[in-house]
């Protein structure tokens, strides 16, 4: 029985001395007594290499490198005694989740949290933590009985104790956790003859749990000799740099005292690792109270960057220099980080420099396509075939890979199901997926071509194939009665899908292609799936469980799967976190992300039990738990110390001034501390260094091209650029090995967001020999020519989603009002409220099922919206009733369509316009309502347009003038041309161009006290209500028209129906009036026609410019669907914005328009 401790600071040769001793013994007696070297899991491979690579040894049968758990396996193999089934981490988590769900009604604090994502994982971690520190449910029960605690703390511990107790009962005699197996290992250790003959070394640890101390004590009692290596100066001050390993030293002394032996301490003080004064000074003086600075000799660097990407790029350049100038191998270099944002950048940046590397982290399997397929398949069943998991399942393309062009077919299928809102068993509706239903994809219905029909037939075939598989899976799972049945059904279904065969074939192909890591991932995923199924059967076997619970438990298990990737080559840069830092004796260590907040890092408790609760428990129960946050915070300097002392020749610290999210960052306080150790150690700002020495950026061809592009772009913009970049360009251009991709970069240099003007034949082939278009198409062109080109030239169509859009709402109102108007023949004035309600219900029953494939009945929200629509329609009818009673104008036509050649007698004729190229322009559309009033053989026409949005329900004459608002003038022009079809006299004149805002009225009053009187209240409410529906637009100033629009106008002075008010003398007032004389209206109509011709001419000339019209400080880009196509940029493209004179008075400006005889209907 002997306990030794090797004590020394970093780099003093403790491990080297141990390895030399072991090697010497192995050489002297290769088959002698066993030597056991215990190390952390992540260090075992490195230590094994030390023996394997020794040419005199070439391995050994005598020495074994193990971690604590593997050591227990080794002893159990010899002694036996472990009859229970060992639980994996995933099995433990699944069991605890199931227990929590079973007993959630017994919980006091956590009852409402048991379904939260990650709760069972946290609870599992807490129970494992208790086991590591030998805290049993009995400890918790006794503590709760003996102490007066806060209610929340008591309920929390009672809940944890309850599940812990159930867990212990569940596994008792049948299963065993890794912590329990170690406890059993302690009990039988004395029976091991192998251990009795062994010398045991423990290296690489800085602290131990209570359970591990118990193992060490048992080893001391049983083995010939136990030696523990500690990185400490032997100072047991709890506030020193070496607090953590010194605490271990204290525990070892207590173990020795308990066993009545002496702890033999061997001190190591001579530095062996560091090859220069800088690193020796860094190690020895880092924790010194009084610093003795020395002259800096260049072995330590501190880099400052503006961003973490710039920082990682510079580290990559430095690594290239290390391998080129210092003849380092990649395996001589390590990068240590703390901030997880760096891990992503290593993956993206280092391959650009052709630097091989291995990041020592375990990645979750969750987001791999295979795992996504499995989890989505489970979620499809859980959510009753919800569209989201269904599409995730299909888009993995694993179950559909046997289809030709499957990715394209899946995109088509997604467009269809998203537009139709396919969910639940609607996936099985063959009528819904009939080929004819594919004629409407997006907003435009069209006849299918032969090619399209064949594509959609393949889409339906693919859909049916995946549905058959899901039904097979669902049927098999529903027929299962217990967990073993579920697991068997899942596996057999995967076999039926040929998934194993597909995965193995795909893996072999990846190997052939040299993508060995991806191939290894497939192997690990399949093995992981099988392991989880085995765990389910092991833990639950024939236990009855609902399908819902099984799927939840299965998913919990899948969440635990992680990739454990073996390095693909030995010569590669090692990357790890500073906390683990298992990269001893590297020639160059890069410590990146040395920012305040990362090093030191604020430590906060993430366990269920808070730090304060831990302290109370430790004091009252006389047990030790895992360190609290304040203790861990004290160890931050030690973490930095261990990380920076891994290098033997050079250490580079780097930090950035800006984080991954653009936030400001400060350098670590340790940077100043390190600078203070040396005279002459300066921080090198990477940006300034590169400006001063541009050649320092030219370490790798790929990155040199990137920086070359940036420099040449700056040069083109007349900025100062070093001449060396022009030389670099010439060299790369003339070198066939370096100029690959250079031409592509140069085209980007002169990139300007300019489109190519189409030649007229090409424009004609796109748009046709005749333009048949709606008014909105021309308005769209005047907003931006490219918008028109993308929409009507390229015919790009945004995916339509199964939801209510603004234009859907507008269509509902239009259709419902037309239905009711036709029913009452436009006579609203005699409708009472009861009749209005009945008509509204009848209209919506006819209209709503036609909206977006019965969207309005798809869920409770849309059914509520339907009711609100009914309220709005009723309010609108009440307003129309009021307006109808007080005007001489009567509705003449509702939803009046117009085109060049009418389809029936109800439609109006639109006379073609002719472009400058002689191309006919046929305008088509639909006028919501035409009202007419006849007096003295003269008929006056009102155009009424229903708008469901407030901004669009305004007539802006400036927009009319510039062609941004062409609708109303066009409608009036069409109506004036169709007197006969409207059944009016030959002399027809414009009355009003008016918008009716269909909306849900919201009333507000400044002084609600005014509404105390009931009669007054009703009157005021009615007035306010009617004011909300006042027509807006432009009215003919002819008094015959004005008087007819509101028959009470002379009496009330200001109309609450139309935008007209009268002065006391009976003339039209300027305030509250929007009027123009008949000639002016005709000039606007003529100008509007000219805008049509001008616009159509530009279209046929092939204009496609990205040139949005900026009007009223707003761009049409704000609501444009084609920004991802045109790539409009507010900085680059601002010079292309079109502007118009917005200060004009449109009434005055329009007077310059000359009317021809045919333009005035007199």
From Swiss-Prot:
The cross-references to InterPro entries, in alphabetical order and at most eight, read: ADDB_N, DNA_helicase_suAddB, DNA_helicase_UvrD-like_C, P-loop_NTPase, PDDEXK-like_dom_sf, PDDEXK_AddAB-type
- Cofactor entry: Mg(2+); [4Fe-4S] cluster
Q: Where is the UvrD-like helicase ATP-binding domain?
A: 1-275
For molecular function, the Gene Ontology terms on record are: 4 iron, 4 sulfur cluster binding; 5'-3' exonuclease activity; ATP binding; double-stranded DNA binding; helicase activity; metal ion binding
Cystine connections: none
What are the UvrD-like helicase C-terminal domain coordinates in residue numbering? Answer: 269-583
The protein's Enzyme Commission number: 3.1.-.-
Tell me the cofactor note. Binds 1 [4Fe-4S] cluster.
Q: What broad class of enzyme is this?
A: hydrolase
Report whether Metal-binding shows up as a keyword of the record.
yes
Record's keyword terms, sorted: 4Fe-4S, ATP-binding, DNA damage, DNA repair, DNA-binding, Exonuclease, Helicase, Hydrolase, Iron, Iron-sulfur, Metal-binding, Nuclease, Nucleotide-binding
A Gene Ontology biological process term: double-strand break repair via homologous recombination
Sites where the protein binds ATP: 8-15
UniProt-listed Gene3D superfamilies: 3.90.320.10, 6.10.140.1030, P-loop containing nucleotide triphosphate hydrolases
Q: Which SUPFAM superfamilies match?
A: P-loop containing nucleoside triphosphate hydrolases (SSF52540)
Kindly indicate whether the keyword Zinc belongs to this entry.
no
For binding [4Fe-4S] cluster, which residues are annotated in this chain's numbering? Answer: 784, 1117, 1120, 1126
Q: Which Pfam families match?
A: ADDB_N (PF21445), PDDEXK_1 (PF12705), UvrD_C (PF13361)
Q: What else is known?
A: Despite having conserved helicase domains, this subunit does not have helicase activity.
In the record, the note on similarity to other proteins reads: Belongs to the helicase family. AddB/RexB type 1 subfamily.
According to its UniProt entry, what is the function of this protein? Answer: The heterodimer acts as both an ATP-dependent DNA helicase and an ATP-dependent, dual-direction single-stranded exonuclease. Recognizes the chi site generating a DNA molecule suitable for the initiation of homologous recombination. The AddB subunit has 5' -> 3' nuclease activity but not helicase activity.
Q: How does it assemble?
A: Heterodimer of AddA and AddB.
Mind telling me what this protein is named? ATP-dependent helicase/deoxyribonuclease subunit B
Taxonomic classification: Bacteria, Bacillati, Bacillota, Bacilli, Bacillales
């Amino acid at each position: 029985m002997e306990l030794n401790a090797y004590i020394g600071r970093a780099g003093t040769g403790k491990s080297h001395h141990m390895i030399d001793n072991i090697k010497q013994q192995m050489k002297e007696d290769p088959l002698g007594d066993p030597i056991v070297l215990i190390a952390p899991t992540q260090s075992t491979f490195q230590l094994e290499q030390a023996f394997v690579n020794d040419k005199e040894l070439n391995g050994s049968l005598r020495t074994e490198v193990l971690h604590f758990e593997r050591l227990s396996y080794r002893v159990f193999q010899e002694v036996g005694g472990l009859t229970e089934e060992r639980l994996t981490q995933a099995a433990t988590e699944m069991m605890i989740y199931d227990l929590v769900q079973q007993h959630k009604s017994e919980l006091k604090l956590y009852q409402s949290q048991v379904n939260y994502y990650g709760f069972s994982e946290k609870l599992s971690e807490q129970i494992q933590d208790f086991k590591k520190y030998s805290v049993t449910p009995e400890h918790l029960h006794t503590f709760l009985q003996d102490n007066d605690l806060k209610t929340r703390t008591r309920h929390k511990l009672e809940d944890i104790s309850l599940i812990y107790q159930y867990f212990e009962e569940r596994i008792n005699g049948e299963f065993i956790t890794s912590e329990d197996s170690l406890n059993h290992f302690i009990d039988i250790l004395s029976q091991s003859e192998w251990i009795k003959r062994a010398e045991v070394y423990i290296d690489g640890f800085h602290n131990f749990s209570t359970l591990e101390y118990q193992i060490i004590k048992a080893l001391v009692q049983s083995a010939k000799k136990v030696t523990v290596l500690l990185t400490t100066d032997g100072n047991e001050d709890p506030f020193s740099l070496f607090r953590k390993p010194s605490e271990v030293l204290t525990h070892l002394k207590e173990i020795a005292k308990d066993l009545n032996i002496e702890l033999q301490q061997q001190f190591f003080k001579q530095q062996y690792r560091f090859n220069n004064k800088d690193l020796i000074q860094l190690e020895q003086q880092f924790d010194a109270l009084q610093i003795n600075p020395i002259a800096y000799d260049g072995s330590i660097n501190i880099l400052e960057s503006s961003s973490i990407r710039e920082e990682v790029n510079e580290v990559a350049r430095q690594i290239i220099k290390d391998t080129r100038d210092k003849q380092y191998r990649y395996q001589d270099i390590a990068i240590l980080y703390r901030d997880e944002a760096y891990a992503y950048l290593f993956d993206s940046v280092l391959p650009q420099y052709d630097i091989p590397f291995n990041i020592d982290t375990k990645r979750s399997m969750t987001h791999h396509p295979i795992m996504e397929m499995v989890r989505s398949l489970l979620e499809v069943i859980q959510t009753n075939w919800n569209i989201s998991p269904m599409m995730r399942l299909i888009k993995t393309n694993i179950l559909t890979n046997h289809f030709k062009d499957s990715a394209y077919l899946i995109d088509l299928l997604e467009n269809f199901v998203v537009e139709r809102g396919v969910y639940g068993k609607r996936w099985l509706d063959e009528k819904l997926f009939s080929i004819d239903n594919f004629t409407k994809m997006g907003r435009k219905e069209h006849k299918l071509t032969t090619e399209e029909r064949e594509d959609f037939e393949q889409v339906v075939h693919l859909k049916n194939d995946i549905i058959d598989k899901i039904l097979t899976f669902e049927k098999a799972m529903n027929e299962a009665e217990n967990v073993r049945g579920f697991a068997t059904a899942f596996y057999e279904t995967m076999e039926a899908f040929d998934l194993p065969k597909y995965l193995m074939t795909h893996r072999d192909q990846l190997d052939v292609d040299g993508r060995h890591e991806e191939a290894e991932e497939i192997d690990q995923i399949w093995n992981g799936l099988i392991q989880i199924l085995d765990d389910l059967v092991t833990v639950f076997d024939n236990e009855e469980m609902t399908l819902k619970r099984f799927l939840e438990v299965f998913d919990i298990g899948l969440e635990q799967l992680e990739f454990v990737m073996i390095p693909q080559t030995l010569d590669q840069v090692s990357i790890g976190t500073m906390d683990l830092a298992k990269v001893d004796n590297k020639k160059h260590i890069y410590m990146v992300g040395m920012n305040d907040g990362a090093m030191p890092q604020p430590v906060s408790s993430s366990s269920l039990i808070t730090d304060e609760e831990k302290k109370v428990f430790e004091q009252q129960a006389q047990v030790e738990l895992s360190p609290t946050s304040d203790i861990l915070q004290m160890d931050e300097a030690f973490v930095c110390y261990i990380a920076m002392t891994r290098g033997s020749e050079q250490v580079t610290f780097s930090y950035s001034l800006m984080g991954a999210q653009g936030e400001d960052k400060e350098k670590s306080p340790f940077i100043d501390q390190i600078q203070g150790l040396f005279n002459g150690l300066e921080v090198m700002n990477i940006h300034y260094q590169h400006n001063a020495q541009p050649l320092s950026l030219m370490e790798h061809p790929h990155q040199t091209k990137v920086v070359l592009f940036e420099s040449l772009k700056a040069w083109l913009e007349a900025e100062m650029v070093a001449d060396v970049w022009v030389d670099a360009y010439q060299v790369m251009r003339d070198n066939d090995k370096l100029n690959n991709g250079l031409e592509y970069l140069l085209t980007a240099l002169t990139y300007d967001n300019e489109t190519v003007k189409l030649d007229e034949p090409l424009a004609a082939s796109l748009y046709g020999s005749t333009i048949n278009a709606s008014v909105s198409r021309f308005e769209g062109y005047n907003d931006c020519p490219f918008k028109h080109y993308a929409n009507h030239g390229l015919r790009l169509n945004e995916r339509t989603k199964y939801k209510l859009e603004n234009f859907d709402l507008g269509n509902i109102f239009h259709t419902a009002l037309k239905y009711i108007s036709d029913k009452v023949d436009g006579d609203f004035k005699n409708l009472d409220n009861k009749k209005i309600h009945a008509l509204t219900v009848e209209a919506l029953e006819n209209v709503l099922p036609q909206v977006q494939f019965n969207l309005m009945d798809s869920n409770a929200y849309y059914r509520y919206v339907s009711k609100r629509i009914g309220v709005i329609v009723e309010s609108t009818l009440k307003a129309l009733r009021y307006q109808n009673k007080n005007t001489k104008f009567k509705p003449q036509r509702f939803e009046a369509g117009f085109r060049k050649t009418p389809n029936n007698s109800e439609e109006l004729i639109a006379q073609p316009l002719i472009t400058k190229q002689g191309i006919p322009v046929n305008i088509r559309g639909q006028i919501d309502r035409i009202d007419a009033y006849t007096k003295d053989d003269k008929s006056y026409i009102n155009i009424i347009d229903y708008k469901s949005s407030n901004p669009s329900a305004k007539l802006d004459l400036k927009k009319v003038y510039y062609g941004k608002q062409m609708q109303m003038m066009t409608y009036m022009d069409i109506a004036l041309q169709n007197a006969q079809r409207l059944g009016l006299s030959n002399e027809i004149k414009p009355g009003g161009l008016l918008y009716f805002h269909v909306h849900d009225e919201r009333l507000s009053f400044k002084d609600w006290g005014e509404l105390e009187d009931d009669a007054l209240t009703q009157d005021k409410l009615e007035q306010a209500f009617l004011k909300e529906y006042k027509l807006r637009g432009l009215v003919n100033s002819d008094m015959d028209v004005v008087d007819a629009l509101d028959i009470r106008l002379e009496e009330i002075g200001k109309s609450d129906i139309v935008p007209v008010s009268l002065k006391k003398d009976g003339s039209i007032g300027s305030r509250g009036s929007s009027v123009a004389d008949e000639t002016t209206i005709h000039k606007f109509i003529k100008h509007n026609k000219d805008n049509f011709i001008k616009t159509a001419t530009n279209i046929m000339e092939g204009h496609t410019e990205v040139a949005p019209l900026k009007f009223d400080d707003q761009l049409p880009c704000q609501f444009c669907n084609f920004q991802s196509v045109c790539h409009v940029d507010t900085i680059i493209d601002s010079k292309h914005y079109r502007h118009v004179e917005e200060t004009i008075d449109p009434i005055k400006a329009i007077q310059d328009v000359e009317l021809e005889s045919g333009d005035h209907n007199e």
